Amino acid sequence: MWQFIRSRILTVIIFIGAAHGLLVVGPKFIRANQEYTLVISNFNSQLSKVDLLLKLEGETDNGLSVLNVTKMVDVRRNMNRMINFNMPEELTAGNYKITIDGQRGFSFHKEAELVYLSKSISGLIQVDKPVFKPGDTVNFRVILLDTELKPPARVKSVYVTIRDPQRNVIRKWSTAKLYAGVFESDLQIVPTPMLGVWNISVEVEGEELVSKTFEVKEYVLSTFDVQVMPSVIPLEEHQAVNLTIEANYHFGKPVQGVAKVELYLDDDKLNQKKELTVYGKGQVELRFDNFAMDADQQDVRVKVSFIEQYTNRTVVKQSQITVYRYAYRVELIKESPQFRPGLPFKCALQFTHHDGTPAKGITGKVEVSDVGFETTTTSDNDGLIKLELQPSEGTEQLGINFNAVDGFFFYEDVNKVETVTDAYIKLELKSPIKRNKLMRFMVTCTERMTFFVYYVMSKGNIIDAGFMRPNKQTKYLLQLNATEKMIPKAKILIATVAGRTVVYDYADLDFQELRNNFDLSIDEQEIKPGRQIELSMSGRPGAYVGLAAYDKALLLFNKNHDLFWEDIGQVFDGFHAINENEFDIFHSLGLFARTLDDILFDSANEKTGRNALQSGKPIGKLVSYRTNFQESWLWKNVSIGRSGSRKLIEVVPDTTTSWYLTGFSIDPVYGLGIIKKPIQFTTVQPFYIVENLPYSIKRGEAVVLQFTLFNNLGAEYIADVTLYNVANQTEFVGRPDTDLSYTKSVSVPPKVGVPISFLIKARKLGEMAVRVKASIMLGHETDALEKVIRVMPESLAQPKMDTSFFCFDDYKNQTFPFNLDINKKADNGSKKIEFRLNPNLLTMVIKNLDNLLAVPTGCGEQNMVKFVPNILVLDYLYATGSKEQHLIDKATNLLRQGYQNQMRYRQTDGSFGVWEKSGSSVFLTAFVATSMQTASKYMNDIDAAMVEKALDWLASKQHSSGRFDETGKVWHKDMQGGLRNGVALTSYVLTALLENDIAKVKHAVVIQNGMNYLSNQLAFINNPYDLSIATYAMMLNGHTMKKEALDKLIDMSISDNNKKERYWGTTNQIETTAYALLSFVMAEKYLDGIPVMNWLVNQRYVTGSFPRTQDTFVGLKALTKLAEKISPSRNDYTVQLKYKKNTKYFNINSEQIDVQNFLEIPEDTKKLEINVGGIGFGLLEVIYQFDLNLVNFEHRFKLDLEKQNTGSDYELRLRVCANYIPELTDSQSNMALIEVTLPSGYVVDRNPISEQTTVNPIQNMEIRYGGTSVVLYYYKMGTERNCFTVTAYRRFKVALKRPAYVVVYDYYNTNLNAIKVYEVDKQNVCEICEEEDCPAECKK
């Protein structure tokens, strides 16, 4: 069945001469590379044919001709003639017109201006999710379409840019190649990105075509959703809002919990709040207190916080609820927008309730001005009061007024129509619309028709036309084939002559389908998690198909990330949308019409409602553990097979939820196809487990692991639930130590979440697998899942590394002794010892590029450790001709992530700052700019103009003396402090300019002035740190005093002949020694650099990095430069590792560059001996670690902790105060960090810090490790007290809690620190265990 809706009739009045009848109709718009069709109809009864000259021409604004096409045509009597013009591909913007001239004695001349449409392509963007967490990967597709929704043949690539919330370019693809009109790629979001709304934009030929946003934020995907709606439509007279609250898991089952409801009235002030227990659905009434409305409707705000039972997971919903003064509204439904004087005018008052249902029984008085109409009446069962009014010939306006007995009032004016005829023609659909099927239309006219003309328009052109002769009938059955050319939308126009008037009607055809009839279906609507699902696709053979599936819960954030049927309709309408024009109806159809001089087109008005044409749419077993909990999946491209179909089998994730599956297809000939709406299916089990596990616990603590069981089988069953002791990592409290599993039984009624818990202790540090299985009905229904929680040490881990570097130019044999420095107070069982042989200096750096520093990196300078080492590694790999493409790819990818991270700290003036929006820093801008310039060799995302702007800003900060001083805050005193005449910072800035080829030329004067300043200061430089950077700057500049500076620097060095090491003793000795090594390399003193390298490699961390950012940056740079000169191609040696009475052998040749590891060294080993014999070079490393109780640290900060009384067992408020203890009066630390770790079971929310002191404000805050740690950053600390309060909440039950700690330290000198432990509630096992878990001592 299909429904008819009355269509409006368009009447064109044409004054016709006695012997003339000609109509020319054509599109009003032209586009490049598109067909243009003109239709000429001859209804001249005297001439058997007319001859015409058609001329299509165009010129630019300055008169240059861009189009000139002519055609001679003849049109026979009572016939149509369709004339096609093919527009050239290179058609450009200009002034276009078509001219029609009569020939061979036929007098006719008409012109029509045509509008050039430049938009010939459009774009769409699809993203796999609307919101992303830090560290996620963004998958996206760009789709380009032409006016026929096909891949544009002339566009081969696009320019794609991704920008962060500050509009910094994070990634760009300058020539993103299209396949079937699609470009697909991804972006790895870094773990510490700029949070907010990001943007993907697509450009073609320099113009933006389409863009889309997505959000990056910290979030937890809710397992359930809450809906809040009025139980009844609220009215002022009710003085209350009645709400229905529904809470359901995404897989459809009800949620049990507590709903906290808050009502806000005028000025958004809290009016009242209530709490109610809800199981799936609940209702609550919130009564007003004398609520008075100023208008017919007013919004109030309702906030509902729903807290799930057992887990405390919370969903917050806010709703605007409209309160109405009256229970109904009214609308005037008119036969036509205007009335005709002297003819009956039918209309009706339509009364509806605010939920859309008819409002019957509404009584009131109806009055109509100017016609003397007045009556009291009541709305019928359809909510209608029907009126038939009789306007006279002199009536100009009808004023329709309604007054109800309850005070409701309505008024509307209706104007008369300006017309000279009562004739009209009507087009009605008599059949469904189906592709390649006949459509039947009934054409009805008030006059007998000798002929009528029909036109079919689609995609901006006339695709069909016909001249019909109904033999003087008033009705005619028109049959047209629904061709593919009409899809997806078309218009049909009919016209005839009635007396001296041409009347016409038109209708819209919406096929609700596309030429590429793509279809997608799945074999099951409900499936168990982790099982296979079969997708069936059909469409055009060989067509591209893009698939995506995502968790329905993501739609709570946004749904604009995906592609929907409505998006395609908007793209199509964007090409072909026409502005309505009541004075030119042909223009409203995208056409123009021209006829003879004595025929006049008058404005047309509607006489009846329109018919909207309806579309043709028809009305004991092996248990697998669930470990895959993706939020989006099935991001896949496939092709339709030759048969026009394709099947695909995929494994669904292990999440129990509802999924949305979407798909589209593109064919070069038939264009785009997309499914009408996403396919929704549910992953659910008849019986399943939901976990609520903590992020981390400490070894030895007694922890309650909480699970919830769900049973959808309709009857109550006894469930056996087993927790496994995987790899002997777990101890079951109150059970024998040898138990490998623990099984409990619990009764599980249907459709109710039943909690069950296990009390355990973790035996080992690291990751602990939590594996649980539950079964009912003797194992016929089972579920099992496995997740990992982190087991943290009770003490603080102390990593150590001893190294020795050897470089043998000829065959040698040497023994290297290693004595392990393990603290006597180290915790028992915490020692780990490893030997590592590294034939390549940078191998470990490459392996650990994504995790070089364990310390926080939450400011603009520290963050560079995620960027700079990748540049150095790439420099090394390319310099040594490495064939390790996977290493190059890894470093390049991490380089992009580091760049993405760093753009958070770019300031509006082009410089860089230590914090977001904190102001500029000379030091950091120099550091970043030179690094990005170097990085641009390996990634094209870096904007050269951005680097140039930073260097320009830098150059503008030079003092007239040539010196540079820091403009921003000082957090690295030796570099920025301005002490010792600012030599260090001036040298640092000069190195940045000298290492940039463009800046070196552009700012040559700045460099020269700076070098003059340094050379004048050289004799007075007595600090090794200052001299090392100044010497390196002189080396880069090729300054005449570079040798003098290097000799002076060497004189300041310290040599250790026993270890064959050289270094410079100062507060920044790693950085100083690294700059010295860079100068050695530039002076080609490679052999002299070996002892310096020996010392540097002994300062490295396990990861291959150095303790801090600048150490790592300069240290790796220096080692890289020397390593490029020393090739491992001659390596050929044997290494003997001796410990206790054991010996282990390693043989190394030039083919081996990977690290050799040996882990099986007993923890009681105190001494190792390593012998190397052969030729070549390598690095010997002994890595060891032990845990040390937190009380064994010396303090250089004063740190005080105070637990505040909250009155709740579930809330922790900790007051933290710290200040620096100076050795000299008024001295201060460098950048200082305070890290607060929380006791097991406690986590913070998004804004945990309050009551902070403002004398020395907190600059940045990071929440780490799943909310179990908070890091605060200060520019520096002095003797002032720096205090704040951190608030955390207990989410999990833990007994025998280990103490937590707070640590404060100087980032650039970690020897300056303080650490304090604190404890919260001292619960014992008996207080948190359930009866069957409790050990024997609890039962006494």
From Swiss-Prot:
Q: What is its main location?
A: secreted
Name residues in a coiled coil. none
Q: Hey, what's the signal peptide range on this chain? A: 1-21
Q: Give GO BP annotations, semicolon-separated.
A: immune system process; positive regulation of opsonization; positive regulation of phagocytosis, engulfment
In which compartments does the protein localize?
Secreted
Give the position(s) of the covalent cross-link described as Isoglutamyl cysteine thioester (Cys-Gln): C859-Q862
User: Out of the domains of life, which is the source?
Assistant: Eukaryota
Q: Which pairs are disulfide-linked?
A: C1217-C1283, C1326-C1338, C1329-C1334
Q: Which UniProt keywords apply?
A: Disulfide bond, Glycoprotein, Immunity, Secreted, Signal, Thioester bond
What is its induction?
By bacterium E.coli infection.
Q: Which residues are glycosylated?
A: N68, N199, N242, N312, N481, N637, N728, N813, N828
- Region ranges (May contain the cleavage site): 580-609
Q: Name one GO molecular function term.
A: endopeptidase inhibitor activity
Purpose of the protein: Plays an essential role in the innate immune response to bacteria and protozoa infection. After proteolytic cleavage, the protein C-terminus binds covalently through a thioester bond to the pathogen surface resulting in pathogen clearance either by melanization or lysis. Initiate the recruitment and activation of a cascade of proteases, mostly of CLIP-domain serine proteases, which leads to the proteolytic cleavage of the prophenoloxidase (PPO) into active phenoloxidase (PO), the rate-limiting enzyme in melanin biosynthesis.
* Protein name per the record: Thioester-containing protein 1 allele S1
The organism's taxonomic lineage, starting at the top: Eukaryota, Metazoa, Ecdysozoa, Arthropoda, Hexapoda
